[in-house]
Curated annotation (Swiss-Prot):
Family under the similarity heading: Belongs to the cytochrome b family.
Binding site for heme b b562: 83, 182
Presence of the UniProt keyword Repressor in the record: no
Natural source organism: Ctenomys conoveri (Conover's tuco-tuco)
GO molecular function: metal ion binding; ubiquinol-cytochrome-c reductase activity
Gene Ontology cellular component annotations, sorted alphabetically: mitochondrial inner membrane; respiratory chain complex III
UniProt remark on cofactor binding: Binds 2 heme b groups non-covalently.
Binding positions for heme b b566 per the UniProt entry: 97, 196
Primary role: Component of the ubiquinol-cytochrome c reductase complex (complex III or cytochrome b-c1 complex) that is part of the mitochondrial respiratory chain. The b-c1 complex mediates electron transfer from ubiquinol to cytochrome c. Contributes to the generation of a proton gradient across the mitochondrial membrane that is then used for ATP synthesis.
Annotated compartments: Mitochondrion inner membrane
Protein name, per record: Cytochrome b
Transmembrane feature ranges: 33-53, 77-98, 113-133, 178-198, 226-246, 288-308, 320-340, 347-367
More details: Heme 1 (or BL or b562) is low-potential and absorbs at about 562 nm, and heme 2 (or BH or b566) is high-potential and absorbs at about 566 nm.
Membrane topology label: Multi-pass membrane protein
């Protein structure tokens, strides 16, 4: 008898991706974040769809429509805060997922890694445009400051900024197009995720040892489906606790003031998940230099496969490289803290030192340490 699961053209794809997929038997909880990101994306699309039913992308009514969602729509407050805090969860998992890739050498899957970086850019763009939509003070000024950075591009910069704005300042045209892009991008991200998975399933998953695990594979279902469900349970407990008890913990109070082009907030800053990049941007006292450093801080991830100089793939058995990895993590925490501080002494110099350390660790220290470890092992 034909097994539908294995013979049906559509179900067969699902079967090979989530049921009969051969998976290393030793992957740890660090491998849960991929599925958690998938759940987050689904949650964001769903809550976003319901928000879009009540939201109006017009400068005169955008702020009021968000207030209306929270006050008058059935469970509108829940949908809105799930969407806002879901974005924070999304970025936490993204950073964990990337960190796992760096630690265990998953970046040696070049295709999967590079499409992952493109996904990161797409998610960052989506989150930025979503932050503009409530049309609060920080929405307006955040949009003004960040889009204005493009004016640093030589020759075409100023024209490009006005083209993106749809006028001579951030206004109705900007809000309308940001809403359109914010709505369409998650679906493009979903398509990119499928390509990401396609490339991953070409090679199979990495594992903590970094060694070939073909001799020891187990089916994805039921072992890892159960494990993923546990991860989702922990995620939902955390997210619901955040939404129910402190929904505004990660937001900015300035965004509860309607956008006013005549009144600049004392400290313009993006959402917490962009603060590390914002700190790098601000640490260079030159517009173009800052923009280049900002883009480089993310694009540098593309260099990891090229700069991999160790004879071992994973950092599991490389204690010196592990120290550098955690130095990098600590440094990113410092950058995140600095990004939220005013531009004054001592924060300026701390930010500059942390920015230099970030690039120096990735470009010089990590490859050098890997070579030194090779020498220690007489390889």
């Amino acid at each position: 008898m034909n097994n539908t699961r294995k013979s049906h053209p559509l179900i067969k794809i699902v079967n090979h991706s989530f049921i009969d997929l051969p998976t290393p038997s030793n992957i740890s909880a660090w491998w849960n974040f991929g599925s958690l990101l998938g759940v987050c994306l689904g949650l964001q699309i769903l809550t976003g769809l319901f928000l879009a039913m009540h939201y109006t992308a017009d400068t005169t009514t955008a702020f009021s429509s968000v207030t209306h969602i929270c006050r008058d729509v059935n469970y509108g407050w829940l949908i809105r805060y799930l969407h806002a805090n879901g974005a924070s969860m999304f970025f936490i998992f993204l950073y964990f997922h990337i960190g796992r890739g760096i630690y265990y050498g998953s970046y040696t899957f070049m295709n999967t890694w590079n499409i992952g970086i493109l996904l990161l850019f797409a998610v960052m763009a989506t989150a930025f445009m979503g932050y503009v939509l409530p049309w609060g003070q920080m929405s307006f000024w955040g949009a003004t400051v960040i889009t204005n950075l493009l004016s640093a591009i030589p020759y075409i910069g100023p024209t490009l900024v006005e083209w993106i704005w749809g006028g001579f300042s951030v206004d109705k045209a900007t809000l309308t197009r940001f809403f359109a892009f914010h709505f369409i991008l998650p679906f493009i991200i979903t398509a990119m995720v499928m390509i990401h998975l396609l490339f991953l399933h070409e090679t199979g998953s990495n594992n903590p040892s970094g060694m070939n695990s073909d001799s020891d594979k187990i089916p994805f279902h039921p072992y890892y489906t159960i494990k993923d469900v546990l991860g989702v349970l922990f995620m939902m407990i955390t997210l619901m606790s955040l939404v129910m008890f402190t929904p505004d913990l990660l937001g900015d109070p300035d965004n509860y003031t309607p956008a006013n082009p005549l009144n600049t907030p004392p400290h313009i800053k993006p959402e917490w998940y962009f603060l590390f990049a914002y700190a790098i941007l601000r640490s260079i006292p030159n517009k173009l230099g800052g923009v280049l450093a900002l883009v480089s801080s993310i694009l540098i991830l593309m260099l990891f496969p090229i700069m991999h100089s160790s004879k071992q793939r994973s950092m599991s058995f490389r204690p010196f490289s592990q120290c550098l990895m955690w130095l990098l993590v600590a440094n990113l925490f410092i950058l995140t803290w600095i990004g939220g501080q005013p531009v004054e002494y001592p924060f300026i110099i701390i930010g500059q030192l942390a920015s230099v350390t970030y690039f120096f660790t990735i470009l010089i220290l990590m490859p050098s340490m890997a070579l030194m470890e090779n020498k220690l092992l007489k390889w």
